[in-house]
Design a protein with these regions (language model features):
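S-adenosyl-L-methionine
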Residues: 1-55, 60-67, 91
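Class I S-adenosyl-L-methionine-dependent methyltransferase module
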Residues: 71-175
Length: 175
């Protein structure tokens, strides 16, 4: 479980639609995007400053609570939702620079090919898989929010690149 630092003094209730529009959209089973207006009302009516988001998924509920000035404790069974939440709700303005992106998308540092070997013929082109292997070779040396932000960016890019959703696999959609 990760503690998301407080956003400072409690801000006025945020506009849930604005929060949803700012938050990176991820097609995720059980996503709470549609519930944000109701969750905002409930959180606004509750006393206290701490919100638990035990099944954080896309992280949008944690982000909403954070924008409302709440301290957030977020967790998930899977690792990637925790990374998404740390990169968004726990990120105090860190952004990847152009140099970071050039490094991340640059040459493979150590020749790793696990992703290419394991996922060949599934979901992505060989070129896409090689980019992911290369990015992971760079990420091995990165730490903290910068690393979380880079991984979150790769997760979101991969989710958009695979338009059929994360639970469909193998063959191209149209011959």
């Amino acid at each position: 479980m990760a503690a998301i630092p407080e956003a400072g003094p409690r801000a006025p209730a945020s506009d849930a639609e604005t929060v949803a529009a700012r938050y990176p959209r991820l097609r995720y089973m059980g996503s709470k995007y549609a519930l944000l207006p109701q969750l905002e009302r409930v959180l606004g009516d509750l006393a206290g400053v701490t919100v638990a988001d035990p099944f954080s998924g896309s992280g949008v509920v944690s982000y909403l609570a954070h924008t409302m000035g709440r301290e957030v404790w977020a967790s998930d069974y899977l690792a990637f939702p925790c990374v998404l939440t740390r990169a968004t709700a726990a990120n105090d303005g860190v952004r990847l620079s152009e140099e970071d992106l050039n490094e991340l998308l640059g040459p493979n540092r150590d020749g790793r090919s696990y992703i290419s070997r394991t996922y060949s013929g599934i979901l992505f082109t060989p070129e896409d898989l090689a980019v992911l292997d290369s990015a992971w070779s760079v990420l091995a040396a990165w730490e903290g929010v910068r690393r979380d932000l880079a991984i979150a960016s790769l997760i979101l890019a991969a989710a958009r690149k695979q338009p059929r959703g994360v639970f469909t696999v193998t063959a191209p959609r149209y011959p």
